[in-house]
Every structure is written in C-alpha cells, then in structure tokens.
Amino acid sequence: MKKTMMAAALVLSALSIQSALAAEYSEKTQYLGVVNGQVVGNSVVKVTRTPTDPVLYRSGSNSPLPAELIIRHAESRPASGGLANITVKEALPDNGEARITLKTSLMVDGKRVALSARQQGEDVVITVPEAQQQIELRTDAPAELEVPVSYRGNLQIALQVED
C-alpha cells in the first residue's frame, strides 16, 4: 500500500456584509500539518484529519442574524442526522484538483437543527431558521481531503462563507 506526504492547510473565511458600503470580514487558518494518506485507485490520495477548531462560521454579535448562509464554489450532499456534506474544490498548479469534504451541522441559539442546503449555480445556500442569539456552522467529524497522487507541496483550500 502506497502512502504519500504533504503539508495541508484549510483556510476558513467568513465574510459578513452589513450594508452595501460597509463590510465586516474575518478569516482564520487551520493548519492540518504534514499529512499521510491512502492511495485510492492509483490516482487520488485520501487524507482524513479533524480540524483544530470545529466552528466554520459564527454570526457576529453586533450584526443582525442572517436568514441564509452562502458557501462559495462548493457542492452539497445530504448526510444522515440532519447534516450535510460540503465539498470545496481548489485548482492546483499542475491542472489537477484538490477537494475537501466537511460534514457540517447548523447550530441555532446553541441547539442543533436540521441543515437545509440547496445548490445555486456554483454556490451552496443554507437556509437558516429564525434565531435570537447566535448561528454557527460547524464540523464535528474529520474532514476528508483528496489530492492527485502526483501532487507534492503545500495546499490551501479556502472555504468562504457569506451571510
């Protein structure tokens, strides 16, 4: 069984737009470290790693709570238990493609609710139930990273969440 090594970082971005003229932007980087993976089908290396911070998005305390969240350049598939698998792809310099899949849940006012997501073009739109205090998009399961077997080097995949 072949194994390969690479350094991987998951870049998580949250973009909150409060008005047409003012924007609040925050970004955090989660470093997954040097990773080893299993070669699948002689073409893809699969790596499973748990992000250090499970919170992908948290609504700002000073801003109005959103009615929906938009994840740019992503795909969504339903998962059991009211969760959704969100996959984000990143083009690589050698014309290959890396992807990360996160099993996500939606927390509204501290309680887990069923995540309702739909595909809208290249984006995923998550409908948020009415909330009083806070909204969180989180992943409590390990992330699955897939890269071409020929790829070597650092890797950053941006997960951009807008409200």
UniProtKB/Swiss-Prot annotation:
GO terms for cellular component: pilus. It holds the Pfam family DUF5462. It comes from the Bacteria. Keywords: Fimbrium, Plasmid, Signal. The keyword Cytoplasm does not apply. It is found in: Fimbrium. Residues 1-22 form the signal peptide. K88 minor fimbrial subunit, plays an essential role in the biogenesis of the K88 fimbriae. required at some step in the initiation and/or elongation of the K88 fimbriae. This is K88 minor fimbrial subunit FaeF. It comes from Escherichia coli. The lineage of its organism: Bacteria, Pseudomonadati, Pseudomonadota, Gammaproteobacteria, Enterobacterales. The gene is faeF.
